[in-house]
Amino acid sequence: GGSGNLYGALPALGGASWARIDFSNSNDFTGAAKATGWAGKLGLVWRAAPEVSLGASYQFKTSLGDMKTSRTGATLSASPDAGSFTDSGRMTVLDFQWPAMAALGVAWQATPTVLVGADVKRIEWADVMKSFKMRYDSAGIGGSVSLALPQHWKNQTVTNVGVAWSANAQLTLRAGVNHADNAIPDLYVNPIFPATVEDHYTLGLGYAFTPAHELNVSYAYAPRVKVTSGGGVTITHKQHNVQLMYSARF
């Protein structure tokens, strides 16, 4: 749906080979659309035995306001075959929330130098990813247009297993595996949310220069997954992720 001059101009864009709304920015850590809100998390740990600890946590669904850009923080454009249409305005992402999540975990000190951990998480995607809703309000020609991308994600179970070996007082080596069922039905998958990978394999090491200074490095690999959407679009996705972290304790 929509209103005003912008909504009236949409039929003229029907012959465009492409049209898009861009509200990205050059910041690696924050986007152009921002919101405030709150969330909460509860957890407990029980030392069941000297070598065994059990844990549980619950993360509440977020309560975020609508994410908005500035008044001219988004652009709507179309290909030259539609008359090179360009407009600026505000993009609003409506009621986008992070889901509730429950987790159970166990840690076992198998030997003085080997720690084994495992946990299982249940993520309630179905409650927050039914539809991705947006509204564009033109600051140029006036009017607005509302958009919705059906998602219909399913709830997801994620299992993690990892091991850490203290090679000596300074060096710790780590490895792990993560498996999750795919939360996105093939019919609704799209490049905006290519969250189709199901498995991750990780390696890591930590080196303590002193009790107060430590360097940690990790690598995660997600094998390639290929999915064809209901519209016939094929999406392939794999991941390589490297992290480097230096810690200083005061």
Residue ranges of model-derived segments:
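Outer-membrane beta-barrel porins/channels
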Residues: 1-250
